[in-house]
Amino acid sequence: MDKLKLLVINNYGQTCHLIHRSLRDLGMDAKLVSNTSTVEDILKQSPDGLVFSGGPTMERAGNGENLIKIDLPILGICLGHQLMAKAYGGEIRTGQYGGFARVDIDIVEEDDILRGIGPKTVVWASHQDEVAKLPPDFVLLAKSNICDIEAMRHKTKPLFGVQWHPEVSHTEKGTLLLQNFIEVCRQRK
């Protein structure tokens, strides 16, 4: 089976390197790239999918709002999830609970990305900022008692966002979420 090429868009989050390593451990040709890259820079590398990492603030998201509209399968993690929501017309707000902590997640829709993970799971997440309103054409996938929009997907495009960090060991079934995203990329290839 051919290796897929996945680019991890570096939003300067403290676990960005773990996303890169997790994808490599799953047999992917993964590469970290700057969030200041241009759309042309990304497309020249012919990736099969993009993963947007977490990061400290929207102000450090570089060219992310343009990159997240590239026509490829995309997984947004934490800040990447928020960036996706903002770029497609959703709303972001400061969360009531900053810092990393255990969060109990209720899976609302077990779609391609969350297949085999629900109906409940435990994750590691930060809610310094969070998605407050879904963008048009997106559907809710998961929620918690801390945040109403823990995960989302586009209705027709392979765009997925999760508030939590599947790349860290504290997240149950985080590897499965990444494997599910890889399968989405493989089916689209």
UniProtKB/Swiss-Prot annotation:
Catalytic activity, EC: 6.3.5.2
GO cellular component: cytosol
Gene3D superfamilies (alphabetical): 3.40.50.880
Domain annotation Glutamine amidotransferase type-1: ranges: 5-189
Disulfide pairings: none
Keyword Ligase tagged: yes
Any Pfam family matching the protein: GATase
InterPro entries: Class_I_gatase-like (IPR029062), GATASE (IPR017926), GMP_synth_GATase (IPR004739), GMP_synthase_A (IPR023686)
Record field: catalytic activity: XMP + L-glutamine + ATP + H2O = GMP + L-glutamate + AMP + diphosphate + 2 H(+)
Active site: 78, 165, 167
Top EC class of this enzyme: ligase
Pathway involvement of the protein, from the record: Purine metabolism; GMP biosynthesis; GMP from XMP (L-Gln route): step 1/1
Keywords, alphabetical: ATP-binding, Glutamine amidotransferase, GMP biosynthesis, Ligase, Nucleotide-binding, Purine biosynthesis
Function: Catalyzes the synthesis of GMP from XMP.
NCBIfam families membership: guaA_Nterm, PRK00758.1
Complex formation: Heterodimer composed of a glutamine amidotransferase subunit (A) and a GMP-binding subunit (B).
Protein name: GMP synthase [glutamine-hydrolyzing] subunit A
Source organism (scientific name): Methanocella arvoryzae (strain DSM 22066 / NBRC 105507 / MRE50)
